[in-house]
């Protein structure tokens, strides 16, 4: 078994525990009380992505920020990291915590998991916020190829042996943290924390497996309109920075799909890691969106 990842960063008001979920140990950071709000981080991050928003959201909600399989302080087992497996992890976590329905704030591949959960089990999702990822129901057009050069890392990370080496490269990861960001989007200290955890061999292999098993397949399904043919009824806010590729996708493509209540907001001058750079904006929009009265 791989040794300790790193010392757990401390955040006032946040408690930590590990739970056995479907055969692996997942780390969960928790704060506050009230209705449950689950935060799903992105690549190559962990629960610490939410350290700026958790204290603000915890004044109104029971905030639950797991390290998803293969990341942070959770187990990083070998094998496939398919979308179905990751969705089942979230369902298992909710069952273990005794949560029958929750709000979700998600980022990057965590936003893919959140949207798939909302499609498969809408009974579990009260409302959903997507950051750092497109609405999977958009209808791409031929101009989509213009975005491909910006996504080179997704294809490279998915390649066995090469992908893990990329994830362990501080120089490459530094580029990914700054390529689509305003100056100071992610602090040097936070980048170091994320990189220290993600560079461990088991987690580097997990990251590559994630791109092969979930992220690239999801991208292809978006291209071919697979998700757009499915019912989608969960109230959803897509909140993305104008500097990131997801914003380009949203501008190029028309939304399609049956049903649904999806609102898109593109934030000028912000990038991919919007929760790191503007936690007050993200938490403020989250509380406003989650409090919006909805028809029964």
Where are the predicted features?
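A short, glycine- and basic residue-enriched loop/turn
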Residues: 46-47, 112, 271
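Conserved HGGG/HGGXW glycine-rich cap/lid loop of the alpha/beta-hydrolase fold
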Residues: 27-73
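Alpha-helical elements of the RecA-like P-loop NTPase motor core of helicases
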Residues: 48-51, 205, 284
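Conserved beta-strand termini and adjacent loop/short-helix elements that scaffold enzyme active sites
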Residues: 31, 267-269
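Catalytic histidine-centered segment of alpha/beta-hydrolase-like enzymes
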Residues: 270-279, 283
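Flexible "cap/lid" subdomain of the alpha/beta-hydrolase fold that forms the substrate-access gate
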Residues: 2-17, 24-26, 36, 64, ...
């Amino acid at each position: 078994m791989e040794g300790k990842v790193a010392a757990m960063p401390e955040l006032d008001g946040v408690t930590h525990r590990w739970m056995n979920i479907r055969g692996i140990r997942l780390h969960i950071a928790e704060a506050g009380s009230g209705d449950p709000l689950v935060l799903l981080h992105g690549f190559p991050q962990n629960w610490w992505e939410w350290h700026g928003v958790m204290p603000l959201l915890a004044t109104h909600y029971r905030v639950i920020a797991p390290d998803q399989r293969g990341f942070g302080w959770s187990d990083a087992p070998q094998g496939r990291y398919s979308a179905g497996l990751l969705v089942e992890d979230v369902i298992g976590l909710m069952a273990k915590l005794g949560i029958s329905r929750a709000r979700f704030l998600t980022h990057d591949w965590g936003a893919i998991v959140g949207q798939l959960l909302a499609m498969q089990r809408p009974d579990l999702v009260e409302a959903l916020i997507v950051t750092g990822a497109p609405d999977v129901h958009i209808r791409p057009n031929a101009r989509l190829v213009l975005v491909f050069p910006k996504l080179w890392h997704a294809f490279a990370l998915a390649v066995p042996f090469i992908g893990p080496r990329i994830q362990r490269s501080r120089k490459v990861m530094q580029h990914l943290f700054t390529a689509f960001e305003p100056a100071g989007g992610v602090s040097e200290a936070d980048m170091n924390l994320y990189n220290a955890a993600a560079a461990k061999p088991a987690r580097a292999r997990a990251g590559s497996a994630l791109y092969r098993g979930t992220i690239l397949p999801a991208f292809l399904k978006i291209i071919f309109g697979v998700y757009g043919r499915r019912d989608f009824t969960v109230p959803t806010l897509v909140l993305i920075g104008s500097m990131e590729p997801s914003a380009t996708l949203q501008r190029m493509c028309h939304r399609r799909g049956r049903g649904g209540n999806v609102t898109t907001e593109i934030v000028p001058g912000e990038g991919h890691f919007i929760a790191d750079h503007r936690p007050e904006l993200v938490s403020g929009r989250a509380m406003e969106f989650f409090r919006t009265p909805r028809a029964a």
